[in-house]
Amino acid sequence: MRRLLQPCWWIFFLKITSSVLHDVVCFPALTEGYVGSLHESRHGSSVQIRRRKASGDPYWGYSGTYGPEHWVTSSEKCGGSHQSPIDIVDHQAHVLYEYQELQLDGFDNESSNKTWMKNTGKTVAILLKDDYFVSGAGLPGRFKAEKVEFHWGQSNGSAGSEHSINGKRFPVEMQIYFYNPDDFDSFGTAVLENREVGAMAVFFQVSQRDNSALDPIIRGLKGVVHHEKETFLDPFVLRDLLPTSLGSYYRYTGSLTTPPCSEIVEWIIFRKPVPISYHQLEAFYSIFTTEQQDHVKSVEYLRNNFRPQQRLNNRKVSKSAVKDAWSQDMTDILENPLGTEASKACSTPPVNMKVQPVNRTALLVTWNQPETIYHPPIMNYMISYSWTKNEDEKEKTFTKDSDKDLKAIISHVSPDILYLFRVQAVCRNEMRSDFSQTMLFQANTTRIFEGTRIVKTGVPTASPASSADMAPISSGSSTWTSSGLPFSFVSMATGMGPSSSGSQATVASVVTSTLLAGLGFSGSSISSFPSSVWPTRLPTAAAPTKQAGRPVVATTEPAAASPGPERDSALTKDGEGAEEGEKDEKSESEDGEREHEEEDEKEAEKKEKSRATAAAEARNSTEPSVATASPNWTAEEEGNKTVSGEEPNQNVVPKAGRPEEESFTDADTQPQPLPSTQVPPAFTDELYLEKIPRRPETTRKPLPKDNRFLEEYPSDNKFITINPADKNSSSMATRPSPGKMEWIIPLIVVSALTFVCLILLIAVLVYWRKCFQTAHFYVEDSSSPRVVPNESIPIIPIPDDMEAIPVKQFVKHISELYSNNQHGFSEDFEEVQRCTADMNITAEHSNHPDNKHKNRYINILAYDHSRVKLRPLPGKDSKHSDYINANYVSGYNKAKAYIATQGPLKSTFEDFWRMIWAQHTGIIVMITNLVEKGRRKCDQYWPTENSEEYGNIIVTLKSTNIHACYTVRPLHGQEHKDEKGSERKPKGRQNERTVIQYHYTQWPDMGVPEYALPVLTFVRRSSAARTPHMGPVVVHCSAGVGRTGTYIVIDSMLQQIKDKSTVNVLGFLKHIRTQRNYLVQTEEQYIFIHDALLEAILGKETEVSANQLHSYVNSILIPGIGGKTRLEKQFKLVTQCNAKYVECFSAQKDCNKEKNRNSSVVPSERARVGLAPLPGMKGTDYINASYIMGYYRSNENVITQHPLPHTTKDFWRMIWDHNAQIIVMLPDNQSLAEDEFVYWPSREESMNCEAFTVTLISKDRLCLSNEEQIIIHDFILEATQDDYVLEVRHFQCPKWPNPDAPISSTFELINVIKEEALTRDGPTIVHDEYGAVSAGTLCALTTLSQQLENENAVDVFQVAKMINLMRPGVFTDIEQYQFLYKAMLSLVSTKENGNGPMTLDKNGAVMASDESDPAESMESLV
């Protein structure tokens, strides 16, 4: 009984919920004013404004007392001298070589469903939740994009951009803001700290067609119409919102364009715009904001949200130096950027076009000059005419060279063929006018066509006309005058609208045989339709925008039959039109807020009503009727939006009295024209389904009894006909009665709501059945289909050797993948993502309600068929205690080689260690930090000190070995209880085990490490630690997919390279993707795998144990087949680095070039030491200094040049900013002048560096074994604003390394520095004259000696290459590289305490004894 009642309660609950949701969604006003409501109030509140002001965030706007001219009162920075936006004068911008290609990472990826849009009241912002990185283009580093903002104008494509080019502004400007993620965790933090940020400006220019890339943005705009509204965006590609070519851009330094106006922005302004249609532009003009003026707030349209342009004030605007980027003529972009009438065409169309027969084979085409010329003069006219013969479409075009000759004779015409004529004016620079009206001519029949539809009636009139008169008509309508037999037809949608692009369109492509057949030209004549029923329209340019929403009332007075101004206006009856217009205009201003609020709710109702209206017209096609209103898609109904790109001022709905009922009166015997701004109805199959707008309700005469059957039995015929016997046949179609509308609309609405509720009911029942019922009745039984996982999953087999790539061809393979903008990588990764799409791989246990809390991320699940099953615990929850979010993953030639799992949660520590113990795991690979970017990524599942108990396992931390990029922690585990809780007797060492954790600390989430070499070392060492008796290696990051999968693929491929000398990344990854979802999560990680494997193949394993170093050195000195030694090959790899690692943009800036002693020895962007920038001074964040990886820390050392006189304070600022406490000064061969040599203060006078002072407090000397001395200075750096003090020790060293001293003495200085560094924090600053070989050698030997002490092994190649990667140009000669091997051989020999028959002379040469092999001596290194 209980189970039967539960669905009933759910149905009752659903009914109440659906009612509440309906009220909330359909009537958002009901929820306004409540905190956290589904639809927040778009009005804001005085409480919110007071709270904003109280928090110190001043209110500002774009107009009134809070407008841009008043920003400076609340934000002083807005009055600065380097403000934005500016006008860019192209010919004054100079090309700078440092501004090369812009590098975009992640911009080609589709956005996630976390990306959302918000109406801030000042703009519409897109908050980017994915990783988008920007570098190059002279930017000082790699920046991360965080948000996108838009600025637009008033309406109709008017100027709205903040920046301009040569004084030309654009309708919309999109701005993408980015910051340096290495220093800050958000853009706002960087602004608060007044640190350098960047912005890209993209202009939107009006085009004829919709830009499909903007569709998700436009849909998002419709969801944030009101202030403070937010919505998630459909996936979009950010790169598609940028210009197709990114090579041409401008660069300048400016400010934020909104308060606080911080002057910290590096602007990138793209020259080329992005297209956007008028229809898409309307979405921007429909955005609302809440404005505050004094103590009154009001809801207004958000328009003109741009800041006035600021003075340049001696700033320089630069242009990119990308090859061929500026070769194109700028006139195509800058001539007419706004997309208004004046910019789309050079003039209005030619007018008064006529076609007259001269004789049986010739026609005369005449026209008048355009009424308005936007870009004079007119050079000539282009006449186009087309026809169809034998189902072949043909077209001819010729030009009248004279702008005064306004006629043309067309010869060799046939009286039996339909011709289409149109004329276009041609101005300078190939600019053209819109096309004139299109004339359709056959014998004595002429038709005028203009607009995007051809509309035809379906019956003859009572009195056919006998003349061939022609009269212009409104857009989308047509006039026929002729005599002949009756025929029937329907309207057909065409693409023959006026051209705005200035280019000639093809008419013949439109006038197909179907169209001509529909026109009735099959040898018979055409019956006429009274031309008086067709309205005319004012020229587009002459129709004011504000009149678009005003009503016009038809009258009983007939209109003039001839074209002219008298006919171009609508008449009113006894002043009613004006009165009603004023009333409606007032109502619109008062109720505009309400109308726009209900706009979305009415949209479905309007569509249904329009369809019902069209159906009723079709059913009553033979009924007598009066003139009806045109389709209504006006500003009043659509919020000033247009449909299908139509002008908003062309379709105005006549309105009289009540909005529910509108009537038109006419004389019984005189047909009446519609108002000048109306369009006759035109329905086709396409229009009926997609574009039929809502029509106003009108009254009509009741149906005759003999025609009532049409209402009861509607026909499927979609023709719109008129009863020829009725004298009142002055309209094309009829309207259903008000009685019909009273039940049609409620029926549609109720049906729709019922359908929605039914769908919701089904969804809720399914969800209840799946979750709630399962939670209560879940039984661990083989007969339950809900809990039996699908373990027969079609696994992608490991590809055979035919698909593997030989190592020798791998370099070529990678170069092919990198070609064409990394297109090969993109294709491969798409294939990886698709490989499991069609497989029915389940994750039932992860989705079970009792297990969901054990998942760190809701979308990272453990596949059922490969999941790791724990031994169930006894107790009431035992049936679900076997679950952990972990999967077995295959390795190279070994099943279940790894366990890929998530970073353990606190609640799953016990499960994690139960898995470790049950699987006999000896190695844990951790590739995440506990907290990254302020977010918890993993919980600490090992003890910090002493021991921790996790379930029945006691874990003890034995030691912590810290390296530059990873940490090793041996963990001792002991099982002290069995599952039943009783004490277990120890059996030898079975209950104890050592588990080693390898923790990589320099791998960012969803990203890749900066360098591949340290990763290879980490993978090799963790893999080598595994012994045959161990179980699977447990690998985890945060989610256990991206970084975890990358590690597994690299490790497996290294084993395959070693075993078979082949690589198959794609095949292997597709195979393991069937075992755990999302392994290798991003394309960037997929590329990194290849980079790491390439590094491994080229460099091979270069780590050598101390006892094998001597033989290894001899082996690399033996020449190979080509005559080169391995030592030479190694050094070539040391000096040849990937270009992306050695980018040096900051050092090449004009403002920084003079700060470099040698332009060939400068810091790479990835390792550059940054300074806190000084406000208002460009380039103050730069110093010629590089971080150098040491043995214990990735930023253990800093190599820099000897300070120049004008960079001395920068040098001390670096010491202060980075808390450096040791300075090692190495003199070079060239002696410096005294004033340049000494960069520190004397005892008598301190050095003032603004934020701090430098004071020398002591000076001492330290004697070395060779009687040389080290001069030691002790300094104190004291803050001027607080009590902070930094103690710095300065070592002024003698000549090092000394060529006249034994090599063993080289390490004497190193030992002094190492001993001092043990007691001090911060990096060690090492400098010689250029920051090159002497400093690099000291850092290299320090790291190698520490490696030898701790690991009894050395890797000279990796240390030297890492130094050259982080500071290009340090090691440039092979002798410098050889010296590192010499020094380490000397150190190994010293440690072995005379082991081996070697002695060293003063020059470092080996004196071999008689019994030694000369080839094994160090002499071979010379």
From Swiss-Prot:
Extracellular membrane side: 20-742
Location of the Tyrosine-protein phosphatase domain: 825-1096, 1127-1387
Biased composition annotated in UniProt, kind: Basic and acidic residues: 565-576, 688-708
Keyword Membrane among UniProt keywords: yes
SS bond list: C78-C261
Residues with glycosylation annotation: N109, N113, N156, N359, N444, N620, N632, N640, N728
Fibronectin type-III domain segment(s): 349-448
Residue sites binding substrate per the record: D1005, C1037, S1038, A1039, G1040, V1041, G1042, R1043, Q1081
PROSITE patterns cross-referenced by the UniProt entry: ALPHA_CA_2 (PS51144), FN3 (PS50853), TYR_PHOSPHATASE_1 (PS00383), TYR_PHOSPHATASE_2 (PS50056), TYR_PHOSPHATASE_PTP (PS50055)
Catalytic activity, as annotated: O-phospho-L-tyrosyl-[protein] + H2O = L-tyrosyl-[protein] + phosphate
InterPro entries: Alpha_CARP_receptor-type, CA_dom, CA_dom_sf, FN3_dom, FN3_sf, Ig-like_fold, Prot-tyrosine_phosphatase-like, Protein-Tyr_Phosphatase
Residues in the Cytoplasmic compartment per record: 769-1422
Membrane topology: Single-pass type I membrane protein
Signal peptide positions on this chain: 1-19
Location in the cell: Membrane
Keywords: Disulfide bond, Glycoprotein, Hydrolase, Membrane, Protein phosphatase, Repeat, Signal, Transmembrane, Transmembrane helix
Active site: C1037 (phosphocysteine intermediate)
Family from the record: Belongs to the protein-tyrosine phosphatase family. Receptor class 5 subfamily.
Official protein name in the record: Receptor-type tyrosine-protein phosphatase gamma
Protein species of origin: Gallus gallus
